[in-house]
Amino acid sequence: MNLDIQKIYEHDIPDGSKLYFGASAKLKREIEAKAAEILEKNEFSEIITPYFSHHQRQSVKPESLIRFGDKQNLEIALRSDSTIDVVRIATKRLKDSDTKRWFYIQPVFKHPTSEIYQIGAEILGDSSIMPCIDVVSEIFREFGISAHLQISNIQIPKIICQLLNLPISVFENGRLEVILGLNLPWLNRL
């Protein structure tokens, strides 16, 4: 192997991947432990899903997935988002469980080499978002984080595109100038 390439493999990590050591590793563990403590106090149970999934393409663009073949050469992907797997597992495999509040603290991966740690929670069978807001607020307060809440729903851009006869790519590509350029009186008043 070329000596320069060997040095890269010995010392560098791929762009987008994470390396924690010393103080940063300690801080990461403290954040995870405090978040888990607050979630458990609020009656959430922890779930750790497999790193690999057959279902990621249902919620993530295929080009963002890191894909492989399983034993039967069926496509699987590294987990790129925890929500879909947690909800799928909780509603299918754990449907008879009394637990309806789940949390997870685990890494997710996106193509080509992006790695982030996700702390998340899901409440099944409750349409109120207030329990979620309360728990998130408590976690943020614990870490001295002040935040503004933005509630989004994929149906909003879809409905706007339908009403204005626009392609969804306007939102996917962040091209709000297209909507503003329509010079709609009701929108101009906003």
What are these regions (language model features)?
Residues N2-A23, E30, K34-L190:
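Extended, charged alpha-beta segments that form solvent-exposed binding/catalytic grooves
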